[in-house]
């Protein structure tokens, strides 16, 4: 290699590193937002023009956890191994590449996004999509590929920005992986002087199985839509935002047997079967409705934020699970009957900065009731066909976050998990499944 080539290579690497690190303070807060670092003033861009449309970002979350018992079931990064109640793990390690084309007026014209997650559990694709923008009035866009479903606030809040280590139980069961394959159309004015620049409307069609399946196992698509009121300043001290969400979908019955809530001759709550031959191949309803609100108060003793989100709807499943499947549920290759349940759940956050933004207190409460038609000792009662899939869980999360800087933070978080006391073996009383998490996060 000649001396000139060596010098050019060193300049290239040095310039790339400078651009790479200079954007460290900027990050996407929501899963489908455009990275704000694309619109930095020309203080860094002139360093190397060839990277002016490219943005590389990422974050890493190593953590240590302790559970109350060996083999504890957990929605805080997965169940513990049978004979273990403590573990080190790399919860997430993301690398993301965004390529943005802009118009002469510096409005977005096209965006390509690719993101992977590489941990000790393997490497998976988290995002792969393209977004095309209408450039006449800069109000509309179309997104196609594998990307976040436009439903709910917590689902769409990025894991590097979320204060609690994990999303709630309901989100993980009903929206596993958060992403899905589909197409989405959006109204979101890019011009900040536009009258409606504080609102956003997303609507799209999706396969429905999300990341849990490699292809759509039936022809039924989910329609998902969300209307968002972006944080709006009422006065100098109060900000308010919110949204409403809708999902209308379903998945194909693999048999003619469809079970719904009812009562037996003794008046006990059970699942009643409909065995009409017309049920086979039909779509069982998967309908979700959601609403959320965020209120932030700015004061001299620290920023305070309240968040509330509520979901309810209808969820098809099996006798033992309410999770969305990647394929038609089977046992030994034989399709399982469909069980239709009515659910509800909610999340509540209280966030308090202590004097400054370095210290933050986190309090979270959430619940998931997979079958609101039954409760407590009705579950597992002799003569009924109710299972552990009906049990209501609620979780209280207590945490403290220390922000070393805009890129690095340390979280101490304790989850107090409670389940209904039922007549089912293993759930006669509250199980010991509380989890403590200590997490370090670095993002760039």
Please report, for each region that a protein language model flagged, where it lies by residue.
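Bacterial N-terminal signal peptides
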Residues: 14-24
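N-terminal periplasmic/intermembrane-space "pro-region" immediately following the signal or transit peptide
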Residues: 2-3, 23-63, 69-71
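Outer-membrane beta-barrel pore domains
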Residues: 30-32, 69, 81-82, 238-248, ...
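Outer membrane beta-barrel
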Residues: 45-68, 76, 80-211, 216-224, ...
């Amino acid at each position: 290699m000649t001396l000139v080539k060596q010098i050019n290579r060193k300049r290239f690497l040095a310039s790339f590193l400078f651009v790479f690190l200079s954007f460290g303070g900027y990050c996407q807060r929501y899963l489908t937002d455009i990275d704000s670092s694309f619109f930095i003033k020309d203080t860094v861009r002139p360093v190397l023009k060839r990277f002016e449309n490219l943005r590389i970002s990422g974050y890493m979350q190593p953590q240590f956890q302790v559970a109350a018992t060996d083999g504890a079931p957990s929605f805080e990064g997965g169940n513990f191994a049978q004979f273990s109640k403590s573990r080190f793990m790399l919860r997430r390690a993301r690398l993301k590449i965004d390529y943005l084309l802009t118009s002469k007026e510096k409005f977005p014209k096209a965006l390509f996004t690719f993101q992977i997650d590489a941990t000790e559990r393997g490497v998976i694709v988290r995002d792969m999509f393209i977004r095309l923008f209408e450039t006449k009035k800069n109000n509309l866009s179309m997104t196609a590929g594998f990307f976040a479903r436009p439903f709910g606030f917590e689902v769409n809040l990025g894991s590097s920005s979320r204060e609690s280590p994990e999303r709630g139980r309901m989100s993980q069961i009903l929206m596993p992986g958060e992403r899905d394959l589909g197409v989405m159309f959006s109204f979101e004015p890019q011009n900040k002087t536009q009258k409606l620049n504080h609102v956003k409307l997303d609507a799209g069609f999706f396969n429905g199985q999300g990341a849990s399946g490699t292809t759509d196992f039936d022809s039924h698509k989910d329609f998902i839509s969300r209307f968002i009121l972006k944080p709006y300043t009422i006065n100098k001290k109060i900000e308010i935002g919110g949204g409403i969400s809708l999902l209308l979908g379903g998945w194909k019955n693999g048999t003619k047997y469809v079970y719904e809530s009812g009562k037996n001759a003794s008046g006990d709550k059970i699942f009643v079967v409909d065995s009409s031959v017309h049920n086979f191949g039909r779509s069982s309803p998967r309908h979700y409705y959601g609403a959320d609100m965020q209120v932030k108060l700015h004061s001299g003793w620290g920023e305070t934020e309240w968040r509330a989100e509520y979901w309810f709807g209808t969820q098809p499943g099996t006798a033992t699970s309410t999770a969305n499947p990647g394929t038609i549920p089977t046992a030994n290759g034989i399709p399982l009957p469909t069980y239709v349940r009515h659910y509800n759940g909610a999340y509540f956050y209280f966030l308090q900065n202590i004097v400054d933004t370095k210290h933050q207190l986190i309090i979270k409460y959430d619940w998931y009731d997979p079958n609101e038609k039954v409760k407590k000792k009705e579950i597992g009662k002799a003569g009924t066909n109710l299972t552990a899939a009906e049990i209501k869980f609620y979780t209280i999360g207590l945490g403290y976050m220390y922000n070393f800087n805009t890129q690095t933070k340390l979280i101490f978080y304790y989850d107090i998990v409670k389940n209904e006391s039922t007549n089912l073996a293993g759930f006669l009383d509250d199980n010991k499944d509380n989890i403590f998490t200590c997490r370090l996060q670095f993002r760039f």
